[in-house]
């Protein structure tokens, strides 16, 4: 039985009026795996198909060379709203609104409703996006108070976030209704077809369609030849991406502390350091310090920071371009005396400058996506063992602009990831700081979370 199907039992099949396909009406489930026991009622599982068929000329979506390097891993994001808006009196109305608007939106994102065919392409066969509806017998404040304990199991299909893809399905969504009238809308989207910017664009279009059924999305489905790559060197990617026994923690960097970090970097010669650069550097420094303490010796390492290429390439791509349109700026550290905060910020800046210079010219096959990072990883892997620290910034992406008609989300929630040495940076809801979701091996995290240098600039976000 597949992962999703194995979660449920005693099901009855009925017809969905929205998409004329079957969904399941589920019994009540009690969640005993969190600090509190919540009643979780699985209402339905539906396949939402595009409102209009995909034309024959678009029946195959071929992957770019960079897409092919991506794992079929679900990237999760959940949008939490305290109310489902004025003029809507029941969850049935919310359900119909979201299903109909999703169906219309998918007609513009035709490959999202298709099925994966190996690593080569998507069969745009309109089979649909999987949508779950769930009712949780608790107020949304329970999720907001306990992001580290309860949130993931309540707003995502169990076991799905960050997992390897569920067969050939590319997108899974869930609508969670709370007793207080709050609602969470989550998506798990395959990294084979999207990056963070693509997720934000799709969610904004779905939300706009819910507000106005005549909305016309204009996603730019990028040609597979727009970002060419030559042969990719062998790396330790499988070792980097494999799941480990890890612990995750969330840290808050207030704007005032980020200003202090930027001043420290500027005083050491880095011109106009960015908030992401300084937060990345201090997290990297403290993580390597903790790892060195746990291991008993320093290990050479590489830092990879994902960079959105849409505005960088020549000619620039539209912000609404859909696909994996990213690269990595990277720094390699071979000696412990290089692990100084100003040096790390400076190296990040130099790597980013080189990336901008490369992609600011017309793209050539000799200027390869991703290799700015993987060539350094290859050099390290040819020698001794090395660690890899992977940073992704969701900051400044328009995730908090996703408005289905009941206002901005009170929280955009990203669940913890089981892959070690991963760091995800997001804006705070009030846009007054950065939240960092950090995942490290379980013997490293206790050292990291008590690092005095880290805690001078960041506070640990605890469940209340």
From Swiss-Prot:
Annotated pathway: Alkaloid biosynthesis
Catalysed reactions, semicolon-separated: 17,18-epoxy-17-hydroxycur-19-ene + malonyl-CoA = prestrychnine + CoA
Enzyme Commission number, as recorded: 2.3.1.325
Keyword terms: Acyltransferase, Alkaloid metabolism, Cytoplasm, Transferase
GO-annotated cellular components: cytoplasm
GO MF entries: acetyltransferase activity
Keyword flag Kinase: no
Pfam families xref list: Transferase
Tissue specificity note: Mainly expressed in roots.
Keyword Metal-binding included in the entry's annotation: no
GO BP annotations, alphabetical order: alkaloid biosynthetic process
Location relative to the cell: Cytoplasm
Top EC category: transferase
Catalytic machinery residues: 191, 403
Cited function: Malonylransferase involved in the biosynthesis of curare monoterpene indole alkaloids (MIAs), natural products such as strychnine, a neurotoxic compound used as a pesticide to control rodents, and its pharmacologically active derivatives, including brucine, used to regulate blood pressure. Curare alkaloids act as animal glycine receptor antagonists. Catalyzes the conversion of 17,18-epoxy-17-hydroxycur-19-ene (Wieland-Gumlich aldehyde) to prestrychnine, which is spontaneously converted into strychnine and isostrychnine.
Family, per entry: Belongs to the plant acyltransferase family.
Subunit structure: Monomer.
Name of the featured protein: 17,18-epoxy-17-hydroxycur-19-ene N-malonyltransferase
